[in-house]
Amino acid sequence: MRHWKAATAGALLLAGCSNASVDQPTATKSVEASAEPQGDNILHITWGGIAEADQGEARRHWSTWTINLVDGGPEYGWLSEKGAAFPHTLNFELAGTGKVRAVALDNRFAPVVREDGSMSQTAEGSPVRRFALLGSTVGPDGPFETLVAGEAKADARTLIKLPKEASARWLRLRIDSNWKGGGATRLSDLAVFGELDQRGSAGEADVSGVYAHEYGPIALRQSGQDLRGCYNNGLGTLRGTVFGRILRLAWFSKEEGSIGSATLVAANGKLYGFWYRPEDKMGSPWNAVRETTLTDADLGACRAALYPPA
């Protein structure tokens, strides 16, 4: 988290923490706007949508993780392992029960240059071809029913409307083939259009706790809708708000002289989401697993950020 001016911190927190608008991510809009179905992309991270890690994801670079499919843009995406056999199964969860009307798969290869000069994606992998979207209102393990099946265009965005509106909270994308006929499969973005019963529903009772992340722990303290936090053992601080299970945060590191924003979703004892710098054209995943409570943790350098003097 580097290179940003502190003067924009307040603007970040007020404007939100995604690289797209809250109501409708601009990156998911079709070239033919009239072709868009009625409703919002309710799978987008700013609507509380999450993506579960696929089998074997921990062995891959984060730029290929499933969470990248809910950020609203094609800059980062998902990439399967080379030797994985079809079908590939990717699991998602909405913030509440949704009325699903359409799905859009984005197979465009649209990498951007990262701050270290590398590209956000490699040309490895063949685009998704045949697929099915399944849904459940019962739980993450189903039972699932097929909502729609179809064929995604290679290197393009494909929007397919459901035969009829369907209710679902847990979604499963089954990928049956790619355009090469084998090898690694890639997908840049997934959008699910419809309406949620309650956008702010399904929130954690309290997101306070210490969450384990590979670069260092994330400590959060919730008081009403207000959030205070600390990351990487005191390297930086967090301030923000919570709405249902959606966390909108600004982060600041005095040591690094940097500032930015984050959009996270607290669900299933985990944090899902991204941190951003304003010059970024995409966010970087900031997924973490709840490890302990604040009471049971040695907060060390984070204590002052979590419990500031009155």
Regions found by a protein language model. Give the residues of each.
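Predominantly extracellular/luminal regions of secreted and cell-surface proteins
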Residues: 33-70
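Low-complexity, Pro/Thr/Ser/Gly/Ala-rich linker/spacer regions in secreted
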Residues: 31-43, 194-208, 294-309
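Bacterial N-terminal signal peptides that target proteins for export
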Residues: 1-7
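Bacterial signal peptide processing site
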Residues: 18-20
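Central antiparallel beta-sheet cores of small beta-barrel/beta-sandwich binding domains
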Residues: 200-284, 300-309
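Solvent-exposed strand-loop boundary residues in beta-sheet-rich modules
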Residues: 109, 137-140, 179, 196, ...
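Bacterial N-terminal signal peptides
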Residues: 7-16
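Aromatic, loop-rich ligand-recognition surfaces of beta-strand-rich domains
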Residues: 70-144, 154-202
